[in-house]
Amino acid sequence: MLAHARERVPAARFVRQDITTWRPEAPLDLVFANAALQFLPDHAAQLPRLFGFVAEDGILAVQMPITLHEASHAAMRLTAAEGPWARRLAPIVRAQPVIAAFEDYYEWLAAAGAKVEVWTTTYVHALDGVEGVVDWFAGSGLRPFLDPLEETEREAFLARDRTAIAESYGPRADGKVLLPYPRLFIVARR
């Protein structure tokens, strides 16, 4: 990902670091996190910490998927819990990121001195059948479940996941499946 970013924006400096310990060299005009912070524990501490790096008149801008309770993610957890891989995947099921209520983010950042805007939006993606839904999550939500498995187990896991997905997302007349994808947006200004 960073190599691709360097190619696209060669004048910028990209550094791979752990966001939980990262500290900028100087206050920043913009701290932008797109679909990254949901993987962090302890949002009550981490978001105010990140806001602390924002310069005067600067912004912390965050977008996080809030999909834990969506049928797609319930299917992943069910598939993980019921297959022959259940014991190996149990820690992953327990470690699924939990996004707090939007009111919590407001309170945490307002207490840190931010002027906060927070809202949710649900995007609806028209995907090519159940396979389109599985493909959509193959590089994101399914990764923690698939990575520990052997190739044949991955195939079996995906087959079971497809079955669970099909029970929740029926195709439309044109064969498309409508996938709701809720997101949380936060803009915190100093």
Segments predicted by a language model, with ranges:
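Conserved catalytic/acceptor-binding region of the Class I
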Residues: 44-45, 51, 55-128, 150
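Class I SAM-dependent methyltransferase SAM/SAH-binding core
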Residues: 1-24, 30, 44-45, 49
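A short SAM/SAH-binding and catalytic strip from SAM-dependent methyltransferases
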Residues: 29-44, 66
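Short conserved AdoMet
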Residues: 6, 10, 41, 55, ...
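Class I S-adenosyl-L-methionine
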Residues: 2-13, 77, 106, 110, ...
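Active-site beta-alpha loop architecture of Rossmann-like, nucleotide-cofactor-dependent enzymes
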Residues: 22, 38, 67, 140
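Membrane-interface segments of envelope glycosyltransferases acting on lipid-linked substrates or membrane lipids
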Residues: 3, 16-18, 35-39, 50-55, ...
